[in-house]
Structures are given as C-alpha cells and as structure tokens.
Amino acid sequence: MSNKRIEQSEIEKYWEIFASLSNGGTHLTGAQAAPVLKNSQLRDEQLERIWDLADVDNDGNLDFEEFCVAMRLIFDLVNGEYADVPPALPDWLVPESKAHLVQANRALTGRQVQFERVEDDDDTPGLKDGFDWYMSPSDKSKYEEIYSANRDGRGDITFESLDTLYSSLEVPDTDIRSAWNLINPSAAPAISKDATLAFLHILNNRHEGYRIPRTIPPSLRASFEKNQIDYQVDNQRIASPAQKWGVTGGEETSTGRKAKFGETYMSRLGIGGKSSYRPAGTDFSGTKTTEDWEEVRLKKQLAELEAKLEKVESASAARSGGRRDTKPALVKRELEQLLDYKRRELRDLESGEGKSKIGASLKGVADEIATVKEQVDALEAHLRTREQVLEGLQQEIENEKSSR
C-alpha cells in the first residue's frame, strides 16, 4: 500500500491559494483556477485531464478537496513523479468524503485502477548511484561550447542537432532519450540553454558510469521552464515524435573507445584547446546562469566548508593529548577566496564588464546584482561567525600548549 499522502503543510498552502481565488466562495470555476493551473507550464490537454480527474463529483467546479487533488497531481507531474497524467486517480489521492463516488464510477464503467509503470534501471550492471547536479567550472565551460556550436537562430537546441555527440559517447540510446525526456517533460521540439546544460550534464555523468536521475530538483527545473513567449509560428505546429521524444527513426547510437565526455566530438568541431573555432552569430553563452544554479553550487561549497569546520570542532572537543591537524587557516583561506570570487562577480555586474557584458538584459543584470549582494552579505556574516569559532579553537590550542 502506498504511503503517499498530502501533507498538512501542503494543505495550508493550497488553502491560501484557494481562498485568494474563490473570494470567499466554496468552489472554483475553470476561469478562476486557470491562472494558477497554467503557471505549471503543463500542456492544456494535460491540464484538462487533471481537471477531469480532480472533479470527482463531476459538477464542473472544484471544491477545496478537489483543488488539493489537482494541485498535487500538477506538483508530481512537474517534479517527474509521473511521466504523464495518470489514467485514473490514485487511491491515496481520493478524498475520503468522495470515495463512494469514485467506487460507484468504477463499478459503472468497469474501470479498475492500473498499476503505474515505473522504468527501473537498477538492474543495469556496473552503474553507480550518487548522481551530483553540481557542475564544475570546467564541465560547465565544455557544455557551453557544445551548446554554442549547435544552437539555432533562437538560441535553442533540438535533439537531432547533437547526433554526432551521441555517437561519441558510451551511452545507450534509451538512456539518451530518457535524459532528454527528463529535462523536456513538455515534449517541446527544442530546449533552452539552461535545459541543454542540464541535459549534457546528465549525459556526462552517465558516460562516467552514474545512473540517470529520475527527477530534477524543482529549483533547477524552474530555471529552464520559465514561461517564454514564442513568436515563431512554425513552433506552434505539431512536432514529430522524433522532435518531441528524441526518437531518431530507429537509429542506434554507436559506441567506441571510451574518452572523456565530449572530447572526440569537440575535436571534430574544432572546439576547445588552442583551436581558433568561433561559433557564428552573437555568442550569448557568456551570460550568467540563473540564481537557482548559483544557489546549488554555493550550497555545495558551503556544505563542504561546514564539514571541514565540523571536523575541526570535533577534533578539539575529543582531543586526547595527541597531535591534532585541524588546519583552521586553510578553512579560513577557502572562505575568504569564495568571498573574493563573489565580490569580483558583483563588481563585474555593476560595471558591465566581463561575462555580463554580452547578452544580459538590464533587468537580468539587476536581478543578478541583487542576488549576488545577498549572497555576499550572507557569506560575510557566515565568515565572521566561523572566524570567531576558529579564534576560539586556536585560543584553546594555545592554552593547552602553555599548560603542558
């Protein structure tokens, strides 16, 4: 039996949304609920099916319980819990007050709940767990070069545009398509720069022997699923299955001698190293990533520093008279280097120099300046706290030395 349920914190959040939309009423019409539902960026036909599932009593409106059901279905779809809208409402999502209606409907239609099909790749031999969304600067630079060499006139990437890259990797076709579907749940014919970087990062890790993740962190998904107006009429036409789901007419990716991700491919294009290759057109690859990506990287760096400081504190607390190697100066220097890097980013953004000089809109630069300022303030406060901790530890060490 599934242990899934809607948590109390979710219910309280949904109630705030419901109350603001219903203006004190007990039900929401389609017009009232539409703005919130469409913010999910799901396709209209998916939202229609979600509405039909959530409207258990079939009155054409959603009461609060039904609204909670609809919001949870949307949340799970956006976060990759479902590949598509389920054909029937899962038992754990059926409101208790309406369970009899669902049972009666199933009895009349003869429709039974189907088991959800989960693609499990745990039986693939030799693959490792522990996929990490953090992109090192060298990896990110490599991804951006591949993106710049293959983007179209609108700055997007299609699945077919990277065929040559696929053939240079030791990654099965099924995994390549799984990665594409993961970062492109709306089955769009092309993806944006941020989504492309995430796609290449997944392929890189799979090439290195890590399993493809099943979900994308919400903060990362939001960074490449922002609502953007598409002025191209041809993009509104129905895309082929190959464009939507990364199916290339039955072709299989060939594999060869394993090399570092993208090296063979970039060598063919003349990218990287001392090559003079420059992609045609305006290069927006220098535009800084969103604060969501930066937040992930910064949190990882801070977690590593926290772990080092924790080791220092543990060694001091459990000292037994032996020689300790706490290296507080090294930890302090790493924190200072991280702060210096953020300050340089802030100066570049304010002066319009460096990477922010190309392709960044005024609004985007202002947002990034505010984000970096907040990060610098937080890091400075964090550094001051840790400096005090280090000073205390150093004082304890000196006291112990003097007492011997």
Swiss-Prot record:
Q: How does it sit in the membrane?
A: Peripheral membrane protein
Q: List GO molecular-function terms, semicolon-separated.
A: actin binding; calcium ion binding
Specify the protein name: Actin cytoskeleton-regulatory complex protein end3
Question: Carries keyword Endoplasmic reticulum?
Answer: no
Report which residue ranges the record marks as coiled coil.
Answer: 290-403
- Residues bound to Ca(2+) are D55, D57, D59, N61, E66
Keyword terms, alphabetized: Actin-binding, Calcium, Cell membrane, Coiled coil, Cytoplasm, Cytoskeleton, Endocytosis, Endosome, Membrane, Metal-binding, Repeat
Q: Name one GO cellular component term.
A: endosome membrane
Family membership, please give it: Belongs to the END3 family.
Tell me any Pfam family this protein matches: End3
- The EH domain sits at 10-100, 139-227
